[in-house]
């Protein structure tokens, strides 16, 4: 399966039991910041934004004072899982980033999608990739 198929079929799909509810944008990005696959709506990000995210995975709490920035959008960092998941909130939407062995699985959402639904979609694919050694 191509990386694009993972984004299209597993991240940008309808959320279980909620037809028509789906993430606003999603991507799979290598630890080096290279985009493996992304939705057409995923924001173009700066290398320093990805560096900040990777630093937060290695040093949890790094982004808390300044916020998580992606594609010029600032998210307030909320409770995640140290070294594994970073979550951010902005207004009625937010972002979930799950770290795997080689990649970051990113999902961005707006209402009516809930934070929990975004977490479920992103973390399920991230956990699957971890099981596959990726």
From Swiss-Prot:
Instruction: Point out residues bearing the modification Phosphothreonine.
Output: 114
Subcellular localization, as worded in the UniProt entry: Cytoplasm, Cytoskeleton
Pfam families linked to this entry: Profilin
Is Phosphoprotein one of the keywords? yes
Which Gene Ontology terms of cellular component type are present?
cell cortex; cytoskeleton
* S-S bridge residues: 13-118
Which UniProt keywords are listed? Actin-binding, Allergen, Cytoplasm, Cytoskeleton, Disulfide bond, Phosphoprotein
Q: Which CDD domains match?
A: PROF
Q: How is it modified after translation?
A: Phosphorylated by MAP kinases.
Residues forming the motif Involved in PIP2 interaction are: 84-100
- Give yes or no: UniProt keyword Cytoplasm: yes
- Mind listing the GO molecular function terms for this protein? actin monomer binding
- InterPro entries (alphabetical): PFN, PFN_euk, PFN_sf, Profilin_CS
Q: Do you know which SMART domains this protein is assigned to? A: PROF
Extract the PANTHER family matched here: PROFILIN, PROFILIN-5
Q: How does it assemble?
A: Occurs in many kinds of cells as a complex with monomeric actin in a 1:1 ratio.
Q: What else is known?
A: The variability of the residues taking part of IgE-binding epitopes might be responsible of the difference in cross-reactivity among olive pollen cultivars, and between distantly related pollen species, leading to a variable range of allergy reactions among atopic patients.
Q: What does this protein do?
A: Binds to actin and affects the structure of the cytoskeleton. At high concentrations, profilin prevents the polymerization of actin, whereas it enhances it at low concentrations.
**Family membership noted in the UniProt record:** Belongs to the profilin family.
- The protein's name: Profilin-3
Q: Name its species.
A: Olea europaea (Common olive)
